[in-house]
Amino acid sequence: MRIVFVLSGLGAGGAEKVVNILARHRSARGDDVHVLALNAETPETYFAYDRSVRVEALGGGSSVPVFRTAARIARLRARLRALSPDLVISFLTKVNIMVVLASRGLGLRLVLSERNNFNTQDMNGLWRLARPLAARLAERLVMQTTEAVNSLPPALKAKAVIIPNPITLQHVRDKQSGTVTRVLAVGRLDRQKGFDLLIDAFADIAGRAPNMTLTIFGEGPERSALEEQVRRLGLSNRVRLPGTTKSPVEWINAGDIFVLSSRFEGFPNVLLEAMSAGLASIAFDCPWGPSEIIDTPAVGMLVPKEDIRRLADAIARLAADATLRHQIGAMGARAVAARYAIQSVLQQWDDVIAAPEVAQALYPAARVST
Protein backbone atom coordinates (compact mmCIF):
# COMPACT_ATOMS: atom_id res chain seq x y z
CA MET A 1 0.00 0.00 0.00
CA ARG A 2 1.20 3.49 -0.80
CA ILE A 3 0.34 5.94 1.98
CA VAL A 4 0.88 9.69 1.93
CA PHE A 5 0.88 11.57 5.22
CA VAL A 6 0.33 15.32 4.92
CA LEU A 7 1.07 17.74 7.74
CA SER A 8 2.08 21.35 8.27
CA GLY A 9 5.72 21.25 9.38
CA LEU A 10 8.53 18.96 10.42
CA GLY A 11 9.31 20.40 13.86
CA ALA A 12 8.85 19.16 17.42
CA GLY A 13 5.05 19.32 17.67
CA GLY A 14 2.56 16.63 18.60
CA ALA A 15 1.25 16.09 15.07
CA GLU A 16 4.80 15.76 13.76
CA LYS A 17 5.54 13.14 16.40
CA VAL A 18 2.46 11.05 15.60
CA VAL A 19 3.14 11.19 11.85
CA ASN A 20 6.70 10.06 12.52
CA ILE A 21 5.49 7.12 14.61
CA LEU A 22 2.90 6.08 12.02
CA ALA A 23 5.28 6.50 9.08
CA ARG A 24 7.93 4.30 10.69
CA HIS A 25 5.31 1.73 11.72
CA ARG A 26 3.69 1.44 8.30
CA SER A 27 7.04 1.42 6.51
CA ALA A 28 8.14 -1.47 8.72
CA ARG A 29 5.00 -3.32 7.60
CA GLY A 30 6.12 -2.96 4.00
CA ASP A 31 4.09 0.06 2.88
CA ASP A 32 5.48 2.69 0.52
CA VAL A 33 5.30 5.75 2.80
CA HIS A 34 5.63 9.41 1.83
CA VAL A 35 5.44 12.47 4.12
CA LEU A 36 4.54 15.85 2.62
CA ALA A 37 5.01 18.97 4.77
CA LEU A 38 3.00 21.87 3.36
CA ASN A 39 4.65 24.70 5.28
CA ALA A 40 8.20 23.38 5.62
CA GLU A 41 10.80 24.90 3.31
CA THR A 42 13.43 22.19 3.85
CA PRO A 43 13.02 18.45 4.52
CA GLU A 44 14.99 18.65 7.78
CA THR A 45 13.06 16.92 10.55
CA TYR A 46 13.10 17.09 14.35
CA PHE A 47 12.06 13.44 14.61
CA ALA A 48 14.24 10.94 12.75
CA TYR A 49 12.60 9.01 9.90
CA ASP A 50 13.67 5.67 8.48
CA ARG A 51 15.50 5.97 5.18
CA SER A 52 12.66 4.12 3.46
CA VAL A 53 10.26 7.00 4.21
CA ARG A 54 10.33 9.81 1.65
CA VAL A 55 9.99 13.26 3.23
CA GLU A 56 9.27 16.33 1.08
CA ALA A 57 8.90 20.02 1.93
CA LEU A 58 6.29 21.90 -0.11
CA GLY A 59 6.58 25.31 1.58
CA GLY A 60 7.97 28.60 0.33
CA GLY A 61 6.54 31.01 -2.21
CA SER A 62 4.65 34.27 -1.99
CA SER A 63 4.52 36.35 1.19
CA VAL A 64 0.84 37.08 0.49
CA PRO A 65 -1.13 34.46 2.47
CA VAL A 66 -3.81 33.75 -0.14
CA PHE A 67 -1.26 33.30 -2.94
CA ARG A 68 0.99 31.22 -0.70
CA THR A 69 -1.90 28.92 0.22
CA ALA A 70 -2.97 28.57 -3.41
CA ALA A 71 0.59 27.69 -4.45
CA ARG A 72 0.87 25.03 -1.77
CA ILE A 73 -2.44 23.48 -2.76
CA ALA A 74 -1.21 23.37 -6.37
CA ARG A 75 2.11 21.77 -5.36
CA LEU A 76 0.29 19.28 -3.17
CA ARG A 77 -2.11 18.36 -5.96
CA ALA A 78 0.80 17.78 -8.34
CA ARG A 79 2.50 15.46 -5.85
CA LEU A 80 -0.70 13.54 -5.09
CA ARG A 81 -1.37 13.11 -8.79
CA ALA A 82 2.19 11.87 -9.36
CA LEU A 83 2.23 9.53 -6.37
CA SER A 84 -1.32 8.20 -6.85
CA PRO A 85 -1.49 6.87 -3.28
CA ASP A 86 -3.91 4.26 -1.99
CA LEU A 87 -4.58 6.44 1.04
CA VAL A 88 -3.95 10.02 2.16
CA ILE A 89 -3.91 10.82 5.88
CA SER A 90 -3.72 14.49 6.84
CA PHE A 91 -3.24 16.23 10.18
CA LEU A 92 -4.45 19.61 11.49
CA THR A 93 -7.46 21.66 10.45
CA LYS A 94 -6.06 23.92 7.73
CA VAL A 95 -3.97 21.11 6.26
CA ASN A 96 -7.08 18.91 6.13
CA ILE A 97 -8.91 21.57 4.14
CA MET A 98 -6.02 22.00 1.71
CA VAL A 99 -5.77 18.24 1.22
CA VAL A 100 -9.45 18.02 0.33
CA LEU A 101 -9.09 20.86 -2.18
CA ALA A 102 -5.93 19.38 -3.69
CA SER A 103 -7.52 15.93 -3.99
CA ARG A 104 -10.63 17.00 -5.83
CA GLY A 105 -11.34 14.69 -8.73
CA LEU A 106 -8.42 12.34 -8.02
CA GLY A 107 -10.53 9.58 -6.45
CA LEU A 108 -8.35 9.19 -3.37
CA ARG A 109 -9.23 7.73 0.01
CA LEU A 110 -8.94 10.54 2.56
CA VAL A 111 -8.62 10.25 6.33
CA LEU A 112 -8.56 13.59 8.14
CA SER A 113 -7.14 13.83 11.65
CA GLU A 114 -8.03 16.75 13.91
CA ARG A 115 -5.22 17.48 16.36
CA ASN A 116 -6.39 20.74 17.93
CA ASN A 117 -9.54 22.26 19.35
CA PHE A 118 -11.27 23.48 16.21
CA ASN A 119 -13.88 25.37 18.23
CA THR A 120 -11.36 27.69 19.86
CA GLN A 121 -8.29 27.84 17.63
CA ASP A 122 -7.65 31.05 15.73
CA MET A 123 -9.07 30.80 12.19
CA ASN A 124 -10.61 33.38 9.91
CA GLY A 125 -14.15 33.01 8.60
CA LEU A 126 -13.27 31.23 5.35
CA TRP A 127 -11.24 28.51 7.07
CA ARG A 128 -13.93 28.05 9.71
CA LEU A 129 -16.62 27.73 7.03
CA ALA A 130 -14.55 25.31 4.95
CA ARG A 131 -13.72 22.94 7.81
CA PRO A 132 -17.06 21.08 8.11
CA LEU A 133 -17.48 21.09 4.33
CA ALA A 134 -14.09 19.42 3.90
CA ALA A 135 -14.86 16.91 6.64
CA ARG A 136 -17.94 15.73 4.76
CA LEU A 137 -15.72 14.59 1.89
CA ALA A 138 -13.46 12.42 4.04
CA GLU A 139 -13.82 8.68 4.47
CA ARG A 140 -13.01 8.85 8.17
CA LEU A 141 -12.35 11.53 10.77
CA VAL A 142 -9.82 10.67 13.46
CA MET A 143 -10.45 12.57 16.68
CA GLN A 144 -8.52 12.32 19.92
CA THR A 145 -11.16 12.73 22.62
CA THR A 146 -14.82 12.10 23.33
CA GLU A 147 -15.25 15.87 23.76
CA ALA A 148 -14.01 16.42 20.21
CA VAL A 149 -16.46 13.90 18.76
CA ASN A 150 -19.32 15.42 20.73
CA SER A 151 -18.51 18.79 19.14
CA LEU A 152 -19.19 17.42 15.66
CA PRO A 153 -22.55 17.82 13.92
CA PRO A 154 -24.58 14.58 13.71
CA ALA A 155 -23.75 14.04 10.03
CA LEU A 156 -20.03 13.86 10.84
CA LYS A 157 -20.17 11.81 14.04
CA ALA A 158 -20.82 8.64 12.02
CA LYS A 159 -17.45 9.10 10.29
CA ALA A 160 -15.53 9.76 13.49
CA VAL A 161 -13.27 7.41 15.39
CA ILE A 162 -11.40 8.24 18.60
CA ILE A 163 -7.69 7.42 18.57
CA PRO A 164 -5.64 9.03 21.34
CA ASN A 165 -1.95 9.76 21.11
CA PRO A 166 0.35 6.95 22.21
CA ILE A 167 3.01 6.93 24.88
CA THR A 168 6.41 6.44 23.28
CA LEU A 169 8.73 7.82 25.94
CA GLN A 170 10.41 4.98 27.81
CA HIS A 171 12.29 6.89 30.45
CA VAL A 172 12.50 6.90 34.21
CA ARG A 173 13.53 10.39 35.22
CA ASP A 174 16.44 11.11 37.50
CA LYS A 175 15.11 11.97 40.96
CA GLN A 176 16.58 15.09 42.51
CA SER A 177 17.53 14.88 46.17
CA GLY A 178 18.17 18.60 46.74
CA THR A 179 16.07 21.20 48.52
CA VAL A 180 14.91 23.07 45.39
CA THR A 181 11.49 22.16 43.96
CA ARG A 182 11.54 22.48 40.18
CA VAL A 183 8.31 23.31 38.36
CA LEU A 184 8.37 22.86 34.61
CA ALA A 185 6.20 23.37 31.54
CA VAL A 186 6.75 22.60 27.87
CA GLY A 187 5.19 23.90 24.66
CA ARG A 188 5.08 26.52 21.97
CA LEU A 189 5.36 30.00 23.42
CA ASP A 190 1.98 31.26 22.27
CA ARG A 191 -1.28 32.34 23.85
CA GLN A 192 -2.86 28.88 23.60
CA LYS A 193 -0.35 27.37 26.02
CA GLY A 194 -1.18 29.86 28.78
CA PHE A 195 2.36 30.36 30.08
CA ASP A 196 1.43 33.91 31.07
CA LEU A 197 -1.12 32.39 33.46
CA LEU A 198 1.47 29.97 34.81
CA ILE A 199 3.98 32.76 35.46
CA ASP A 200 1.31 34.73 37.33
CA ALA A 201 0.48 31.65 39.41
CA PHE A 202 4.16 31.12 40.18
CA ALA A 203 4.50 34.77 41.20
CA ASP A 204 1.54 34.35 43.57
CA ILE A 205 3.38 31.72 45.63
CA ALA A 206 7.03 32.66 45.01
CA GLY A 207 7.27 34.56 48.29
CA ARG A 208 6.14 31.60 50.41
CA ALA A 209 8.18 29.05 48.45
CA PRO A 210 11.67 30.57 48.16
CA ASN A 211 13.25 27.27 47.09
CA MET A 212 11.04 26.80 44.04
CA THR A 213 11.98 27.49 40.40
CA LEU A 214 10.05 27.49 37.12
CA THR A 215 11.41 26.42 33.74
CA ILE A 216 9.37 26.75 30.54
CA PHE A 217 10.78 24.91 27.52
CA GLY A 218 9.81 25.95 23.99
CA GLU A 219 9.93 28.70 21.41
CA GLY A 220 7.31 30.90 19.82
CA PRO A 221 5.91 34.37 19.20
CA GLU A 222 5.21 35.16 22.86
CA ARG A 223 8.83 34.84 24.03
CA SER A 224 9.44 38.59 24.35
CA ALA A 225 6.17 39.19 26.17
CA LEU A 226 6.83 36.34 28.59
CA GLU A 227 10.38 37.52 29.28
CA GLU A 228 9.07 41.01 29.98
CA GLN A 229 6.42 39.56 32.32
CA VAL A 230 9.14 37.69 34.23
CA ARG A 231 11.24 40.87 34.57
CA ARG A 232 8.26 42.95 35.65
CA LEU A 233 7.41 40.46 38.40
CA GLY A 234 11.00 40.38 39.64
CA LEU A 235 11.43 36.67 38.90
CA SER A 236 14.38 36.71 36.51
CA ASN A 237 16.53 34.65 38.88
CA ARG A 238 13.85 31.98 39.35
CA VAL A 239 12.07 31.63 35.99
CA ARG A 240 13.93 30.34 32.92
CA LEU A 241 12.92 30.06 29.25
CA PRO A 242 15.80 28.03 27.77
CA GLY A 243 14.22 27.24 24.39
CA THR A 244 13.47 23.94 22.71
CA THR A 245 15.11 20.73 23.86
CA LYS A 246 16.60 18.14 21.52
CA SER A 247 14.70 15.33 23.24
CA PRO A 248 11.99 14.91 25.90
CA VAL A 249 14.54 13.37 28.28
CA GLU A 250 16.15 16.80 28.70
CA TRP A 251 13.03 18.44 30.09
CA ILE A 252 11.81 15.34 31.94
CA ASN A 253 14.95 15.45 34.07
CA ALA A 254 14.58 19.19 34.71
CA GLY A 255 11.56 19.10 36.99
CA ASP A 256 9.70 17.68 39.96
CA ILE A 257 6.25 19.06 39.10
CA PHE A 258 4.81 19.38 35.59
CA VAL A 259 2.14 21.97 34.76
CA LEU A 260 -0.11 22.12 31.69
CA SER A 261 -1.46 25.68 31.70
CA SER A 262 -3.16 25.66 28.27
CA ARG A 263 -6.26 27.67 27.49
CA PHE A 264 -7.28 24.91 25.06
CA GLU A 265 -5.82 21.74 23.59
CA GLY A 266 -6.56 19.03 21.07
CA PHE A 267 -4.88 16.31 23.09
CA PRO A 268 -1.83 17.23 25.17
CA ASN A 269 1.02 14.87 24.23
CA VAL A 270 3.32 16.60 26.65
CA LEU A 271 1.05 15.78 29.60
CA LEU A 272 1.18 12.09 28.67
CA GLU A 273 4.97 12.22 28.43
CA ALA A 274 5.30 13.92 31.81
CA MET A 275 2.97 11.49 33.54
CA SER A 276 4.53 8.43 31.90
CA ALA A 277 7.91 9.46 33.33
CA GLY A 278 6.47 9.71 36.84
CA LEU A 279 6.25 13.50 37.10
CA ALA A 280 3.51 14.70 39.43
CA SER A 281 1.30 16.68 37.05
CA ILE A 282 -1.18 19.55 37.29
CA ALA A 283 -3.40 20.67 34.41
CA PHE A 284 -6.05 23.25 33.71
CA ASP A 285 -9.36 21.55 32.95
CA CYS A 286 -9.41 23.10 29.49
CA PRO A 287 -11.06 21.69 26.38
CA TRP A 288 -9.99 19.13 25.20
CA GLY A 289 -8.04 16.26 26.69
CA PRO A 290 -6.80 16.95 30.24
CA SER A 291 -9.94 15.65 31.96
CA GLU A 292 -9.74 12.40 29.99
CA ILE A 293 -6.10 11.87 30.95
CA ILE A 294 -6.38 13.04 34.58
CA ASP A 295 -9.67 11.32 35.33
CA THR A 296 -9.13 10.91 39.07
CA PRO A 297 -7.23 12.93 41.72
CA ALA A 298 -5.04 9.90 42.38
CA VAL A 299 -3.21 10.32 39.05
CA GLY A 300 -2.91 14.11 38.83
CA MET A 301 -4.38 17.44 39.84
CA LEU A 302 -7.02 19.08 37.64
CA VAL A 303 -7.91 22.73 38.33
CA PRO A 304 -10.56 24.97 36.74
CA LYS A 305 -9.37 26.44 33.45
CA GLU A 306 -7.58 29.79 33.65
CA ASP A 307 -8.03 29.92 37.45
CA ILE A 308 -4.65 31.35 38.48
CA ARG A 309 -5.30 31.19 42.23
CA ARG A 310 -6.35 27.52 42.13
CA LEU A 311 -3.34 26.70 39.98
CA ALA A 312 -1.04 28.46 42.45
CA ASP A 313 -2.60 26.53 45.34
CA ALA A 314 -2.12 23.20 43.54
CA ILE A 315 1.55 23.95 42.82
CA ALA A 316 2.11 25.03 46.43
CA ARG A 317 0.48 21.86 47.74
CA LEU A 318 2.70 19.56 45.67
CA ALA A 319 5.80 21.63 46.37
CA ALA A 320 5.24 21.28 50.11
CA ASP A 321 4.60 17.52 50.10
CA ALA A 322 7.26 15.28 48.53
CA THR A 323 5.37 12.14 49.52
CA LEU A 324 2.24 13.30 47.69
CA ARG A 325 4.35 14.18 44.64
CA HIS A 326 5.83 10.70 44.53
CA GLN A 327 2.44 9.02 45.03
CA ILE A 328 0.73 11.01 42.28
CA GLY A 329 3.69 10.56 39.96
CA ALA A 330 3.72 6.79 40.39
CA MET A 331 -0.06 6.41 40.05
CA GLY A 332 -0.12 8.66 37.00
CA ALA A 333 2.62 6.67 35.29
CA ARG A 334 0.75 3.40 35.79
CA ALA A 335 -2.55 4.87 34.61
CA VAL A 336 -1.32 6.31 31.32
CA ALA A 337 0.82 3.24 30.58
CA ALA A 338 -2.31 1.09 30.77
CA ARG A 339 -4.50 3.36 28.64
CA TYR A 340 -2.16 4.75 26.00
CA ALA A 341 0.17 1.87 25.14
CA ILE A 342 1.70 2.40 21.71
CA GLN A 343 0.79 -1.02 20.32
CA SER A 344 -2.88 -0.50 21.15
CA VAL A 345 -2.93 2.92 19.49
CA LEU A 346 -1.09 1.66 16.39
CA GLN A 347 -3.61 -1.17 16.04
CA GLN A 348 -6.44 1.37 16.05
CA TRP A 349 -4.70 3.27 13.25
CA ASP A 350 -4.13 0.02 11.35
CA ASP A 351 -7.86 -0.70 11.55
CA VAL A 352 -8.66 2.69 10.02
CA ILE A 353 -6.03 2.29 7.30
CA ALA A 354 -7.28 -1.19 6.38
CA ALA A 355 -10.93 -0.15 6.15
CA PRO A 356 -12.41 -0.73 2.68
CA GLU A 357 -13.30 2.22 0.55
CA VAL A 358 -16.76 3.56 1.16
CA ALA A 359 -19.35 2.47 -1.37
CA GLN A 360 -20.13 6.00 -2.47
CA ALA A 361 -17.20 7.65 -4.25
CA LEU A 362 -15.98 10.83 -2.65
CA TYR A 363 -15.72 12.91 -5.81
CA PRO A 364 -17.53 12.96 -9.18
CA ALA A 365 -14.47 11.76 -11.11
CA ALA A 366 -14.10 8.79 -8.80
CA ARG A 367 -17.51 7.51 -9.87
CA VAL A 368 -16.18 6.66 -13.30
CA SER A 369 -12.67 5.60 -12.28
CA THR A 370 -11.65 1.96 -12.48
Feature annotation, model-predicted:
Residues 13-21, 97-98, 181, 185-204, ...:
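A conserved mid-protein helix/loop that constitutes part of the nucleotide-sugar donor-binding site
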Residues 280-284:
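Short hydrophobic beta-strand element within catalytic cores of glycosyltransferases
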Residues 136-172:
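Donor nucleotide-sugar binding/catalytic pocket of nucleotide-sugar-dependent glycosyltransferases
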Residues 231, 310, 317, 324-338, ...:
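A short, well-ordered alpha-helix in the C-terminal region of glycosyltransferases
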